[in-house]
Each structure stands twice: as structure tokens, then as C-alpha cells.
Amino acid sequence: MVTLSFFDVFLRVYAIINSHARVRQILVKGSDGLVTAQAPGKLYIAGEYAVVETGYPAVIVALNQFVTVTVTKAEGIGRINSKQYQENSLTWQRNGDEMVFDNRDNPFHYILSAIRCTEMYARELGRNLSVYTMDIDSDLDANDGKKYGLGSSAAVTVATVKALDQFYDLHMTKAQLYKLAAIAHLDIQGNGSLGDIAASVYGGWIAYRSFDKAWLAAERREHGLSELLSMDWPQLSIELLQAPKDMQLLIGWTGSPASTSRLVDKIAIAQAKERVEYQTFLSASKNTLEGLIEGFRQQSLSAIQAGIRANRQLLNHLATLTGVEIETPILKQMCDLAELAGGAAKSSVLAAVIVALR
């Protein structure tokens, strides 16, 4: 029997997550207008490709590594700073309700989209907009800016919305926060399930089904944000799960993060040519994920491990069907070693491998 020393093959182990992990909330809005908000990164446990389709389930876990956004009231000129992009700090001013930037060539697209959507919502609620300095720090990217593939763009979107929610006293519920952050993120990425947004908002383990994005696009042409945030979104489902107490989750990183949006695009192009086979994959994924989710509900580690193994097989079939490499050689090696040690393992969007152990 291989001992747990096999995990030395992992280039990086991020976390051992207990089933009670939750989003760290902020705390107090100071008299100087300072607000700090945090949102965690995420990892898809299973269902990461099928969940892009409306109503198909995935299991996602929020991590104990965070993006932190701090907003401080300023006079005249505001700034947006990030430790990951120190050379690209933005300065801005107000022209009425508009933000006017000194330069537009910047890496802050998700942050700016989150600001735009949250301030649009704030204006609908009658709030007066202010000038402020925003500082961003992240545990989810390396110091050189390399992404670990843990949902940093979603986390920074959520943390920005949360901070401005506090700053403008908007009192959003988690459901409203999810919907507003999802809109802001979708405006930039253009595709995806938005499950990473849900994980960053709710924390812990969740079972997630995506909403109908065509419905949302149509409704946005007819309704403002305050109305959209109060609506029931078709097919959207977010269920909090509890992991068995005897289960450990280990996460290994290959050192080669993947672009989620590009992978989704490649899968979409390929599945258009293989419609029947792709529908078969979706049906099998749904059945597998429903069994996996029931394993969490019943606190059955064996059922969870069986679901992870079945999902790995489905992803390998999807790779054959589409020609998209999902389980790279190093990921295969990591998964196989995990199985030898008594765990259940699969890849997660090329960048990491997850292992469920007793």
C-alpha cells in the first residue's frame, strides 16, 4: 500500500478543508468610511463541464484562500490598487455618476464591471455615489500574477460587490449578491456556469445548477437591476452541503493553470458537431452528480468517492468525444497515485486534482 507520502508528487497542496468552511464576513464599517470584504476561491469537485448547460448539477467547494477588497472614502480623486498589478494602479474621478479613468489599458476588467453594476444598483435605490480608494489583495494568485486556477476572477468580483454593498449600505441578501456578481462577471467572461460566483458568495460545499442565461439576457432588456435581483431565476439552484466528518479534501496543483472560458469555448465548438453523444454525456453527468450529491446528504464517503471516480470516467469520455485534453499526463499520474493510496481523485479544469480520503 502506498503511504500518504505520495502527495509529494503534488507541486502544491493548497488546503485541507473541513466541512464547516464558510465565507469570512466583514465586519464593521468604520467612521472613516473604510470597509473590508473577503470572498474565497473555489474548486469544482465534479460536474464542471456539464454545469455550463442550464439545470445540470455540479458540486463545488469554497477554499480557505481569499481575495480581500478594502474601500476607503476619498476626496476628489480615487484609486484602484492591487498588489498583483502594482504597476497598473488606476486613478479616477467622478463626472456626475460616471467614473472617469486616467488610463483604460488595465487588468481590472472584472473589478470595474463589479463596480459598475453595484453602483447602478445603488443609484436605483437612491444612493448618492462617492469617490473612494479601493485596495485589492489576493491569496489566489502567485506574487508574479500567475493564476492558480482557483476562481480568482469570481472571488474578486464577489469581494468588490460585497465591499460596495457595505460602503453604500445596500443590505443585499446572499441571493441578491450572487445575482449581481453573476451579472457583472457574465458581462466580462460571456460564458460559463457562474458556479464559482456561487461558491464565493455562499462558502463551504454547495450543489449548484446554473440558471437560464438566455432568459437573463432577455429580462435585462426589460428590467432594471433591482427588479432582476428580486426575481426567481429559472433553473438556478444553490444547495448547501455538509461533507462527512471523516473526509479530507486535498488539492494538488500542476503548475499549469487553465483558462476556464477558453476550455468552455472549445467544448462548445466540439459538442455542436457531436450533439447526440454530447446529450448522452450530459445525461450521464446528471445521474452521476445526483448520486454524488445524495452521498453528501447521507454523509456517505463511499458514495462520494464512487461519484468522483464515475465523474473522472465521464470526463475522459468527453475528452475523447471533443478532442480537448482534460486529464493531462501529470494529472493522470496524480489521480492514479491517489487511488493507490485509497482515495478517489479526478482532475479539475486541468489545473488541479482533488482527492477525497478517509
List each language-model region with its residue ranges.
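Short, positively charged and aromatic/hydrophobic N-terminal segments
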Residues: F10-R12, I16
